[in-house]
């Protein structure tokens, strides 16, 4: 388009850097950039570039909830059986019900003993969300040590369900759960459940697989 009269302005950017996911909010951010007075060219999505400042400032988060679709996130530990169980669960739903089903799995660099994330969606309508879950109906954490390491409840919707695998009793929960987590549970009407799945697994001969 060089030297062409009334040439269009071409704006480009990159996404997926560092294996970062691209969400509907990111897409909206791109369009907000394009319609701004001085759109940024050669931008990056998903990362915070504090060196060359190519990243776009995120727009107001948008939530695209598909009616009738259940969205679940599971925090697990590598080789604890969480990923395998979720693969079986989503296969059973897809093969034996009339529901549509989708699953994504994310891992860290460790093959065993590292963090795992399972993202499951199932519902009555076709699922077209090609990104990890950013708003969940149900979140489960299968390793109690994560409560002080990660923002486990980020994205859990108001009135959602949180299940924690833990050996702590009620008094210990009050002692060990971070204040930020307790505040979120109270303010967002979260249904909070605990289960000692580790003990149950040992008693029935499953070992470390919960």
Language-model region placement:
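Peripheral docking tails and interdomain loops at the edges
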Residues: 1-65, 191-210
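Active-site cofactor/cluster-binding pocket
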Residues: 1-2, 19, 68-78, 83-210
